[in-house]
Amino acid sequence: MIKNAFISFQEQKEESKGSVEFQVFSFTNKIRRLTSHLELHRKDYLSQRGLRKILGKRQRLLAYLSKKNRVRYKELINQLNIRELKTR
């Protein structure tokens, strides 16, 4: 998914780029980039730590969105092709 296409899609719905959906989208792009980097550089421990931090941030945002608006959460999960949160 191209960032500009998602921005134009989001601008139709909301004007703010600080929305939860946009933040999750940008974290997902960073995660995919770091994952492909780590496939080549397995011992890059600093990048591994950064990846874990970004995963935690995205997980917290998704948990917030699932509590506040379940419909938007489901749409975002399907749009980005990521798994749902594990519930305890």
Curated annotation (Swiss-Prot):
Where does the UniProt annotation locate this protein? Plastid, Chloroplast
Q: Which domain of life is it from?
A: Eukaryota
Care to name a GO molecular-function term for this sequence?
Answer: structural constituent of ribosome
InterPro entries membership: Ribosomal_uS15 (IPR000589), Ribosomal_uS15_bac-type (IPR005290), uS15_NS1_RNA-bd_sf (IPR009068)
Gene Ontology annotations of biological process type: translation
Q: Quaternary form?
A: Part of the 30S ribosomal subunit.
Identification of the protein by name: Small ribosomal subunit protein uS15c
Q: Which organism is it from?
A: Barbarea verna
